Amino acid sequence: MCIRDRYEFTNQTNKWIKDNEFNNGIINISIQHTSASLIIQENADPDVQIDLLNFFNNLVPMDNSLYIHSTEGKDDMPAHIKSALTNNQISLSVKNNELILGTWQGLYLFEHRIEKQNRLIVLHYLGD
């Protein structure tokens, strides 16, 4: 089994919004990498995350015979493909100093590499 990781950052984003006293507007969240992505996903049942990770690992296997590009190892091209199939930016509404998300929704950094990486997420806000 080949599980990568995902990191929820909903609370950190809401804290950033509150700390900057942003009231109503739009936030754009982007990741500056090509081997990780951003997703909105259920944050209540951890099994959903495991199923999602397993689905992507089956969809895009780590099999060097399938890819030409492998400069950074066996997870290199699969990580790029998974990133291309998901999002590198998410835009959300902010109302009353808080992200507008559904009851079970959370923001996740979806890591596609085997080894842990340092990732940079950029937040940009438009509004009052």
Residue ranges of predicted features:
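Short beta-strand segments
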Residues: S30-Q32, K95, F110, H124
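Active-site beta-strand/loop microenvironment that shapes enzyme catalytic pockets
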Residues: Y7-D51
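Mid-chain, well-packed structural core segment of small domains
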Residues: F56-G102
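Short, small-residue-biased leader/transition segments that mark boundaries at the very start
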Residues: M1-I3
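Broad gene-expression machinery/nucleic-acid interaction feature
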Residues: I26, S35, H80, Q89, ...
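C-terminal binding/interaction regions
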Residues: G102-E111, K116-D128
